[in-house]
Design a protein with these regions (language model features):
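Conserved phosphate- and dinucleotide-binding cores of soluble alpha/beta proteins
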Residues: 9-169
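Binding-site signature for planar aromatic cofactors or substrates
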Residues: 6
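Short, small-residue-biased leader/transition segments that mark boundaries at the very start
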Residues: 1-2
Length: 169
């Protein structure tokens, strides 16, 4: 990232600072939102950066259509993993009840994040205790980030049909 930032500056392009302290507000989406306003994010593969930005933000605003709202999470949890740790992380996620599979591109190659890591999409069935599961996964050596975000958004815009929406605070 530092090299890209320096190259961009040569072309008079200004990128986001690579050393973040505080951000006023983050607007983002979510793959799922549970009844406790926890989020599953990372379907696009940028979960490490998304989590850094959300945790640096003074205010977090999430926008999602009504299909993304669930009582309990029931979709795969993205887990960003250092490539060297893929096999051990896969075994350890299986030990805590997950069914991990490496995210691949259409042509069968592994999906590589913008940070050079891989994503394991992990099925845990219905997740009733997301914070505890996040902590278990995060404690596995080689796991860089988990797609369960437990920082509660300040505002959620829930899009409904016909252009209507609800504001959840």
């Amino acid at each position: 990232m530092l090299f890209r930032s320096l190259e961009a500056e040569k072309g008079n392009l200004h990128l986001i600072d690579t050393v973040l302290d505080k951000i006023d507000i983050v607007f983002d989406g979510a793959d799922q939102i549970d009844k406790g306003k926890n989020l599953i994010k990372g379907g696009g593969g940028a979960l490490l950066r998304e989590n850094i930005l959300i945790n640096a933000a003074k205010k977090v605003v999430i926008m999602a259509d009504e299909s993304k709202f669930v009582t309990n999470f029931n979709r795969d949890v993205p887990v960003e993993v250092h490539p060297l740790a893929r096999n051990t992380v896969t075994k350890n996620i299986s030990k805590i009840g997950g069914r991990p599979k490496i995210r691949t591109l259409d042509r069968g190659y592994p999906f590589i994040t913008e940070n050079g890591n891989i994503i394991l999409d992990c099925n845990f069935g219905v997740i009733k205790k997301p914070k505890q599961l996040r902590e278990k996964i995060k404690n596995i050596s080689g796991v860089l980030e988990v797609g369960i975000f437990t920082r509660k958004p300040d505002i959620i815009y829930k899009a409904r049909s016909a252009g209507k929406f609800d504001v959840i605070k």
